[in-house]
Amino acid sequence: MSIVPVVKQMITLSLLMLTGFFANRFGILGRDAQKWMSKLIINITCPALILSSVTTSQRLENNQMVLIIFGAAIAYYLILPFLAKGCALAGPRNRRSEYTCMLIYSNLGFMGIPVANAVLGKEAILYISIFMAIFNISIFSYGIILLGGTGGGKLQFKKMINPGTVSAVAAVLLYLGSISIPTLLLEPITAMGNTTTPLAMMVIGASLANGKVRDLFTEKSMILFTVLRLLGLPLLAWGVCQILGVQDRLLAGALILISGMPVASNTVMLCTELNRDGDYIAKGLLISTLASVVTIPLISMLL
């Protein structure tokens, strides 16, 4: 894939993030506004984007491919924890759970879907949606155990049923059943979904303004983590696709992009819910988000 269109898309996304950054600095998009905008994106606009994109995208050659994507997603979230635990050994002993969590869970909703839509086209959103469904099951089961310690975290099955998971499953069912959404409903759903990318990028930019950016890159272990998160994992995913001979361009592209996304914002929310200090993960989220502006065009060259 040519890097030029990817760079153009990342410049667009960066300008949107910059808008959010300055909106925060000028008191327009403060912490409270970021919270309600995040809820709006997670609960309304992102599910709308998933539904509209999947139902209007070009169909795959056969439905068997959907099962293959599900299998790939399940394998991804079963194997990655073992790799992440091994990589986390390079970090501080008291932060290994956080490192493991940050390496496993990437930002699929806020950045994965918008970037995949921009880089691979809306056909790729079906792939990301399936990964999102497995992601939600994983983070609200293993993620809670990981951050909650040996006895502090309990599985929260209700948390697995959320707008992101429901819309992802609904989109797959609509796709498999060749069911079309009536135009009267599809047009407003599409309009809402189209706001996801600008809103999400602005919220991410605003969150970057909450801390001191200059202090983020002073910790060596965090820099190592950022390299692993944004370059090491996507290179590994690319290598696995080459070894296994993955022919489907969108599946390989989705795997590589998902592996190279910054830390998921859900991890910080989990820390808050489990009464665990989330500042360290928030730091990893900010660093990886900033660095991804440069690394995403680089890994896109592998697609």
Name these PLM-found stretches.
Residues 1-303:
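Alpha-helical transmembrane segments of multi-pass small-molecule/ion transporters
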